[in-house]
Regions:
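Alpha-helical transmembrane segments of integral membrane proteins
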Residues: 2-3, 92
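Metal-dependent catalytic cores of enzymes that make or break cyclic nucleotides
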Residues: 45-172
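Juxtamembrane or sensor-core-proximal signal-transducing alpha helices
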Residues: 3-36
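General structural signal for secondary-structure boundaries
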Residues: 1, 11-12, 83-87
């Protein structure tokens, strides 16, 4: 009888140890997943930074422009009273702004870096960088609205911007 009781107690102890080990494994697995997610986020941020640096190198007239645009975008998002952005939304705006000029990749260097005034035809090509940028960035899950930032970043509140000449109203 006592042997059976000891066996039951031992089995209960082993089962409890198994449960503890499983809980530890789940915690470790959860920590590993979180670490992988953070690593992926860092990789995406590094990729965005590298691409924006490449853009700045291609366009000699706008060195560091992407970084400044991102900093200004973040500052505006933080201080825009009409819409209180979450920290995550501000981070997305910041990262997206780094790539607002990615469409310039498709602009010929002769047009992009021309020291003289652009002809009407060249200016038309240059203006297309917004649409091309939107096409390049469309569908990026980690920057869901970057394509819109690329397309509309030359629009103006008075409707005199491009590519569509729409009015941008910041107040309701």
């Amino acid at each position: 009888y006592w042997g059976f009781c000891l066996l039951v107690v031992a089995m209960d102890i082993f089962y409890k140890l198994y449960q503890i080990r499983q809980a530890d494994n789940e915690k470790n697995l959860e920590a590993e997943v979180l670490e992988a997610v953070e690593g992926t986020k860092k990789l995406m941020i590094d990729a965005v930074t590298a691409i924006s640096q490449m853009l700045d190198e291609k366009d000699v007239y706008t060195q560091e422009h992407s970084k400044r645009a991102a900093e200004y975008s973040k500052l505006i998002a933080k201080n825009l009273k009409a819409h209180e952005f979450t920290d995550e939304e501000i981070s997305l705006i910041y990262r997206s702004a780094f790539l607002h000029d990615i469409g310039k990749i498709a602009v010929p260097d002769a047009v992009l870096n021309k020291p003289a005034k652009l002809t009407d035809e060249e200016y038309g090509i240059m203006k297309n960088h917004t649409v091309w940028g939107g096409q390049i960035l469309s569908g990026l899950e980690f920057l869901p609205q970057a394509d819109m930032g690329a397309v509309y970043h030359h629009e103006r509140y008075d409707g005199k911007g491009y590519p569509y000449g729409i009015n941008i109203c910041l107040w309701n």
